[in-house]
Amino acid sequence: MFILILILNIRNENLSTFNSIVTHDLMLSAAKTLAKLNPDMTFIYVSGSGTDSTESGRTMWARVKGRTENELLRLPFKAAYMFRPGLIIPANGVKSKTKSYQLMYDVMKPFNPLLKRFGSVITSEQLGRAMVRVGKDGYSHSIVESSDLKKIGKY
């Protein structure tokens, strides 16, 4: 079993060309190569909550991620899953190397127990477990929303 995990989180509207190149073009290029090398693999793409599969919404990043998901699902993999986590809270004291993210995590830390009750909030540990489980065992839907990821990623 081979699982490829790529997380691209670019949401700045002013970087729409870069966003499209990195989120769509680079991802599709890598995925097409992998599909040729091993069509029997399971491919998991982490996009994010709010991704627009219709490709017609108002938000550029959501349309690009939706287009990327749609094209990935058409590739000849054994299985492909599009993970759409919302807020990901780092688990086990993991620190972000991005200072602005770490500042946000530090400010939000007192609220984490409350935030974890919402379906769109997931820990990095739950997300990792969900990736391994879906990669190994599959899942009934190709689009996996944050609330489902949370259930799959439970101990």
State where each predicted segment sits.
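SDR active-site strand-loop-helix element
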Residues: 43-49, 83-85
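Oxidoreductase cofactor-interface core, primarily capturing Rossmann-like NAD(P)-dependent enzymes
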Residues: 53-153
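Beta-hairpin (beta-strand-turn-beta-strand) motif
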Residues: 6-7, 48-49, 88
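Short, flexible segments with low predicted structural confidence
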Residues: 42-45, 98-100
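Internal, well-ordered alpha-helical scaffold/interface segments
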Residues: 28-32, 41-44, 62, 66, ...
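Non-catalytic positions within long, well-ordered alpha-helices that form the structural scaffold/packing
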Residues: 35-36, 73
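NAD(P)H-binding glycine-rich loop region in Rossmannoid oxidoreductase-like domains
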Residues: 1-35, 52, 135
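A short helix->loop->beta-strand "cap" motif at the edges of active sites that frequently abuts
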Residues: 38-41, 77-78
